[in-house]
Amino acid sequence: MKTKAAIKKIREAAEKAGLEFEQFERKGHTGIRVGSKKTTIGRHTETPDGMAEKIYRQLQDELGQGWWR
């Protein structure tokens, strides 16, 4: 999965849920905050599907269980 597509999917889900979305750059990763949850995603062109799912799972407390499916 393209990293930009993963971030876009998270941003759209946050907007749909009425939660604040923030994207910020760190040294080698992009930080993402949805509501009160923070996570990072590597700054690569591609993010492996398994890694993207782990990132999505980290945000399910805010966005709801299985929101990415």
Predicted regions and their residues:
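Basic nucleic-acid-binding interfaces
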Residues: 1-26, 33-69
